[in-house]
From Swiss-Prot:
EC id: 3.5.1.98
Cofactor note: Binds 1 zinc ion per subunit.
BP GO annotations: chromatin organization
Protein's organism: Arabidopsis thaliana (Mouse-ear cress)
Designated gene of the protein: HDA8
UniProt-recorded name of the protein: Histone deacetylase 8
Length: 377
């Protein structure tokens, strides 16, 4: 008998976003290549995530729900009206345009973005209304790079941040912890809550730094928040090549203690499978087992602090097949499924965690000195 289930929120309209072809994510055709590649954030990656949840071994543990599109008033919980107007006007033009580096809006993109935001809001509302405790918003385009005033990194609207705002505005949540395991810094979410002590944002990412005007944040350990939010933005830049043991060490030594000190009543896990060993858009070495352990740890965090309430929001993950396998493994961990139902098809990358452990210990020392609410841990 299945007693442990995840409520998955999805809408087919999100497949209509077409992020162009070219050289990787540039949309550029140099004229001398016979075969161009799809943009890494293409619909195929999400189709496989969808199908593995529908037809894979985990399918009996999944309840399906259809998300609703967000409306403008909901978007204004996080984004400025000027920015939303810019997106609306770009959509009205009916032409393909590059909103930010590598971030293309085409006919159908705005509809998909509204569905991604609204589907995530639907999932959070589902939890707030006590219809379920564990929900996963399977959405695209992704959102965690989108800032209140601008697009960035394939992201138009910050889906997870909007869900956090909804939770805080509901009256039933006063403190939300957001844990981001995408391989890239969740700069948009961090930016939106940078002066808040109601939201703890923790981002585990490769140490990539800033990548231009749309992404001025570095994701470094000294970006701690400002004013009353000082100390509530914790960055964990991990060395390239960090794998399962390194991520588990960071989760247990940095993330879990910080969340325990913060004491949230809602937990949001921002998920990217681009931290896997084979992702074209990252340089880390997580395998299915690593994602499974993260799922187990996050389930424990939710049970300890938020009465088991856990919202998961999909972000990156660009290996068209392996990202789906990693999602399956993570949800197995969240659902406490005792043994893996799928063997890992390609995980053979050797891991040396010494560099990751050294980085985590250095970050821990920094936090105890400069983060007020973590002093004494």
């Amino acid at each position: 008998m299945v007693t442990n289930r995840v409520d998955v929120f999805w809408h087919e309209g999100m497949l209509r976003h077409d992020a162009v072809e070219g050289v990787f994510d540039t949309g550029y055709d140099p004229g001398f290549l016979d075969v161009l590649e799809k943009h890494p954030e293409n619909a195929d990656r999400v189709r496989n995530m969808l199908s593995i949840l529908r037809r894979g071994p985990i399918a009996p543990h999944v309840n399906w729900f259809t998300g609703l599109p967000a409306i403008v008033s909901e978007l204004l919980m996080f984004h400025t009206s000027e920015y939303i107007e810019k997106l609306v006007e770009a959509d009205k033009s009916g032409e393909r345009c590059e909103i930010a580096a590598g971030t293309f809006m085409s006919p159908g993109s705005w509809e998909a973005a509204l569905l991604a935001a609204g589907t995530t809001l639907s999932a959070m509302q589902h939890i707030l209304d006590c219809h379920g405790k564990i929900a996963y918003a399977l959405v695209r385009p992704p959102g965690h790079h989108s800032q209140p005033t601008q697009a960035d990194g394939y992201c138009f609207l910050n889906n997870a941040a909007l869900a956090v705002k909804l939770a805080l505005n509901s009256g039933s949540c006063s403190r939300v912890a957001v844990i981001d395991i995408d391989v890239h810094y969740g700069n948009g979410t961090a930016e939106g809550f940078y002066t808040s002590d109601k939201v703890l944002t923790v981002s585990l990412h490769m140490n990539h730094g800033s990548w231009g005007s749309s992404h001025p944040q570095k994701g470094s350990i000294d970006e701690l928040g400002e004013d009353v939010g000082l100390g509530y933005n914790l960055n964990v830049p991990l060395p390239n090549g960090t794998g399962d043991r390194g991520y588990e060490y960071a989760m247990n030594e940095l993330v879990v203690p910080a969340v325990r000190r913060f004491g949230p009543d809602m937990v949001v896990l921002v998920v990217g499978q681009d931290s896997s060993a084979f992702d074209p858009n990252g340089r880390q070495s997580l395998t299915m087992n690593g994602y499974r352990r993260i799922g187990q740890i996050m389930r424990g965090v939710a049970e300890e602090h938020s009465h088991g309430r856990l919202l998961m929001v999909q972000e990156g993950g660009y290996h068209v097949t392996y990202a789906a396998y990693c999602l399956h493994a993570m949800l197995e961990g969240v659902l406490k499924i005792p043994e893996p139902h799928l063997s890992d098809p390609i995980a053979y990358y050797p891991e040396e965690e010494a560099n990751a452990v050294a980085a985590v210990e250095s970050i821990k020392t920094y936090h105890t000195e400069f983060v007020p609410f973590l002093r004494g841990t």
